[in-house]
Amino acid sequence: MSLYSETPSAALLPSGFADLLPGEAEAEARGIASVMEAFSRHGYQRVRPPLLEFETSLLGGSGESLAPQTFRLMDPNSHRMMALRPDMTTQIARIASIRLQDAPRPLRLSYSGSCIVVGTPGREADRQISQAGIELIGPDSAQADAEVIALGAKALAELGIEGVSFDLSMPALALGLIEGVIPEADREPLLHALDRKDASAVAELGGPIAGMLAVMLRAAGPADRALDLLASLDYPKDVVGYFERLAASVAAIRERSPDLRLTIDPVDFRGWRYHTGLCVTVFSTSSREELGRGGRYLAGQEPACGLTLRPQALLRAAPVSASRPRCYVPVDLDAASLSGLHKAGYATVSALSHDEDAAAQARHLRCTHVWKDGAARPL
């Protein structure tokens, strides 16, 4: 009996889900391994949270913001509702605040794995996504922000991704201004206008802070120019600290990575539901899609900063790497020769019988080399 149905419909997968075939799957695995090795070299220890958790655990606290993107199902054993993670950050926060509460701080953790998101009806997008990231838990400082961003930049550089840009934002800066003077009932239209970068609507809805918000709109762009414009504003005492932290974080990043391209969007609020300070989105000139995002948040009651990269997006942005050469070898090749091929970087494909025409079989199996006269010979 076949392990799967051989009807034509067997190849049909739900929208947003896809098989990764050998070349793609291997490239993604190599990319994740490269990123995780970069994190490990800098002291970030790997953890592996489960794909499923009880709904009350996964979506409690700041995880509540993930509810609209979460698949749910009933546990047939406990009859409790469970949820498939749409993001791993809240799981890392749980591990840090409960399982590793006695571990020394700063706590540096890394992770990788698959997530499942509900997606947006009518839009074609991945609903099974890969994540690989780091979280720095304990310190609340510009240097901690800079460490996370600089390490993310190093990981991308090792993949050969060029034209990388880190777009910084500080949602609390504009939100602090708005909450101080704009009635709650009038805030949503103003936030929507800022999100659309609609200067005329902001001027109409901004009331006494319309001028400051207009400067913030104009400030979006290269970090140095943005900071110069933002520094010209007269902030209330309870808001000025957000600007000072943004400037300090940029300076700390520059110190670690002088050549890193930084931009600032002071009125970017999209997707920063549980973040409390500096936020970052990663882009590249070689791709139109977002490569990753992160920022500052609370892990339980502790300050934390993290960055989550999207390996599938990284794969599309990175240059195509040469695949491992494949050598077709005889069924009875000795162990020493096999070991030598593996150390030289070859994948070996073994014959299952004594072939009359090894070269023909090697080509059939898409090998690049064949074992002949005691060595790997190119086909």
Curated annotation (Swiss-Prot):
Q: Name one GO molecular function term.
A: histidine-tRNA ligase activity
Q: Where in the cell is it found?
A: Cytoplasm
Organism's domain of life?
Answer: Bacteria
- A Gene Ontology BP annotation from the UniProt entry: histidyl-tRNA aminoacylation
What coarse category fits the chief subcellular location reported for this protein? cytoplasm
Q: In which pathway does it act?
A: Amino-acid biosynthesis; L-histidine biosynthesis; L-histidine from 5-phospho-alpha-D-ribose 1-diphosphate: step 1/9
Gene Ontology CC: one annotated term: cytoplasm
> Does Cytoplasm count among this protein's keywords?
yes
Which UniProt keyword terms apply here? Amino-acid biosynthesis, Cytoplasm, Histidine biosynthesis
Its quaternary structure? Heteromultimer composed of HisG and HisZ subunits.
Q: Which family does it belong to?
A: Belongs to the class-II aminoacyl-tRNA synthetase family. HisZ subfamily.
- PANTHER family hit by this protein: HISTIDINE--TRNA LIGASE, MITOCHONDRIAL-RELATED, HISTIDYL-TRNA SYNTHETASE
Extra remark: This function is generally fulfilled by the C-terminal part of HisG, which is missing in some bacteria such as this one.
Role: Required for the first step of histidine biosynthesis. May allow the feedback regulation of ATP phosphoribosyltransferase activity by histidine.
The name this protein goes by in its record? ATP phosphoribosyltransferase regulatory subunit
